[in-house]
Design a protein with these regions (language model features):
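Charged/polar low-complexity intrinsically disordered segments
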Residues: 141-142, 147, 154
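Core catalytic alpha/beta fold that binds nucleotide/phospho-ligands
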Residues: 1-136, 150-221
Length: 221
């Protein structure tokens, strides 16, 4: 079953995860206007879109909703606030009628090591290095970016990457730069939360997460 889960975050907010597969056709879950548009898209884009609409239907029970985008590129649907993310193999949606929401998902990969300096300051990298050293004393005591064989380091970096992507989406109208966000990951477990800051406006947001051997997922509301 492609549906991995639907989680009720609170009475107003639902989070869903879908495993992308080629089992559905566009006309089974997508509104007709979306089906027409998808004919011009590549096969990968079609599969991702079908997964998103299948998950949207599973969460809301509706097949008439059409996903649009506002001027900031943020997805929109009638009657809900929505955030969407997809990565290789998975699609995720979070929706709420009253709350602003954001979600991000990333499959496990080592690309994150190559872009450490892009999204983390030296201070943030040093904080992660101390966290990993404390949680796993046998981990290599080298530069974060070179610890490609350390599972804990990969997890920490992916959590921070997804958290900043989530914060960017949450404050989409501000178009935050990576150095205008600060992440403070203090522990790593299968599920949890940690503080993240919008430095531009001095706002703190708790980012919730779940992670396993396949992916890392973060969200906020």
């Amino acid at each position: 079953m492609p549906l991995v889960f639907i989680k009720n975050i609170d009475n107003d907010t639902r989070l869903g995860l879908w495993k992308i597969a080629d089992e559905l056709h566009t006309d089974e879950v997508c509104p007709q206007m979306v089906c027409n548009e998808l004919k011009q898209k590549c096969a990968r884009r079609q599969t991702e879109t079908v997964a998103v609409y299948a998950l949207l239907h599973a969460i809301t029970g509706r097949t008439d909703l059409v996903i649009g985008h506002n001027a900031d590129g943020k997805p929109t649907i009638d009657g809900y606030n929505i955030s969407i993310s997809h990565t290789i193999g998975y699609a995720s949606i979070i929706i709420s009628k009253r709350k602003n929401v954001a979600v991000d998902i990333e499959y496990r990969n080592n690309r994150v090591f190559r872009i450490v300096d892009k999204f983390l300051t030296k201070q943030e990298q040093n904080m992660l290095k101390e966290l990993i050293k404390t949680s796993n004393p046998s981990s290599p005591q080298t530069n974060i970016a070179s610890q490609t064989d350390c599972y804990d380091t990969q997890t920490a970096l992916l959590l921070c990457w997804c958290a900043k992507e989530t914060l960017y989406k949450y404050f989409s109208e501000e178009k935050l730069m990576f150095n205008e966000m600060q992440t403070k990951l203090k522990t790593i477990s299968s599920e949890g939360s940690f503080e993240n800051f919008n430095l531009k406006r001095g706002t703190l947001k708790d980012i919730m997460y779940m992670q396993n051997e396949k992916f890392v997922l973060t969200y906020t509301l």
